Swiss-Prot record:
It catalyses: fluoride(in) = fluoride(out). It is found in: Cell inner membrane. It comes from Nitratiruptor sp. (strain SB155-2). Na(+) binds at G75, T78. It is a multi-pass membrane protein. This is Fluoride-specific ion channel FluC. NCBIfam families: crcB. Keywords: Cell inner membrane, Cell membrane, Ion channel, Ion transport, Membrane, Metal-binding, Sodium, Transmembrane, Transmembrane helix, Transport. GO terms for cellular component: plasma membrane. GO terms for biological process: cellular detoxification of fluoride. The gene is fluC. PANTHER family: FLUORIDE EXPORT PROTEIN 1-RELATED. Belongs to the fluoride channel Fluc/FEX (TC 1.A.43) family.
Length: 128
């Protein structure tokens, strides 16, 4: 493994984690919601960005940038573990509908967001 790639992943992860904290906290604060809208926001945003970057990086770009942005930044920005914990806590509190809605929204919106980004990229820059 190349040290430059490892370093790039670390740098991307640093900024992704900070971004996740700031975005999720801000979204939760402005919505005043009991629903974990902050986690949903970073997951949907990250899914959109990964769809766009997937298409961009297919156009042959330095693999260090791909590792930094996809593995590092987006790996730290999105958060399946927080989504899992929040859903489990809802279930434990008997909030079954909210838990189901959380699962449904995270799955449908993240996949749709990635798909939308790929379509947008193709419209903007042409397909592969």
């Amino acid at each position: 493994m190349n040290f430059s790639v490892i370093f790039a992943v670390g740098i991307g992860g640093f900024f992704g984690a900070i971004s996740r904290f700031l975005i999720a906290t801000w979204m939760q604060k402005i919505t005043h919601s009991l629903f974990p809208v902050g986690t949903l926001t970073v997951n949907v945003l990250g899914s959109f960005i990964i769809g766009f970057l997937y298409m961009y990086f297919e156009q042959s770009i330095n693999p260090i940038y791909k590792a930094m942005f996809i593995t590092g930044f987006l790996g730290a920005l999105t958060t399946f573990s927080t989504f899992s914990l929040e859903t489990l806590l809802m279930i434990q509190d008997g909030l079954w509908i909210r838990a189901f809605l959380n699962i449904l929204l995270n799955v449908i919106l993240t996949i749709s967001s990635t798909f939308a980004a790929i379509i947008l990229f193709k419209k903007m820059y042409g397909g592969l």
